[in-house]
Amino acid sequence: MSKKVTNIVEELVTPILADMDLELVDIEYVKEGKNWFLRVFIDSDNGVDIEQCGMVSEKLSEKLDEVDPIPHNYFLEVSSPGAERPLKKPKDFTKAIGKNVYIKTYEPIEGEKEFEGELIGFDGTTVSVTVKDKTRKKTIDIPYEKVASARLAVIFF
């Protein structure tokens, strides 16, 4: 059985990003309407700019043309993950400590499956978030394996 497109793209883009001191955040391969999109989200400690996205796009496009893992036409998009960056890997959670996050879980924890608040800790097995409970704050400890999805959350004042 052939590898998933996202796995192949990850193998192709990782050395490109390493050479540019960038990191891979996520890869999406989706059909929207009649069109297929291959989206590669990149970042660094200093953020990314349009020139870096363009360079990665050019280099990755060359590699994709060589390997040709996608049998039909598609649009390649390389961009920053934006302000509400997904938290996919353990190191993403560690880097997000002290920031506002939005987390969905596979099953209820203390009667809830969605949490928004400040990420105050992550030890590799437990994600600790301070959430607002009516007029006070409380800490919720979420087992890492129960996190279905997580992202940074922007607070508007």
Swiss-Prot record:
SUPFAM superfamilies: YhbC-like, C-terminal domain, YhbC-like, N-terminal domain. InterPro entries: Ribosome_maturation_RimP (IPR003728), RimP_C (IPR028998), RimP_C_sf (IPR036847), RimP_N (IPR028989), RimP_N_sf (IPR035956). The keyword Cytoplasm applies. It is found in: Cytoplasm. Belongs to the RimP family. GO terms for cellular component: cytosol. Required for maturation of 30S ribosomal subunits. It comes from Geobacillus sp. (strain WCH70). Gene3D superfamilies: Ribosome maturation factor RimP, C-terminal domain (2.30.30.180), RimP-like superfamily, N-terminal (3.30.300.70). Its main location: cytoplasm. CDD domains: YlxS_C. This is Ribosome maturation factor RimP. It comes from the Bacteria. Keywords: Cytoplasm, Ribosome biogenesis. HAMAP family: RimP. One of its GO terms (biological process) is translation.
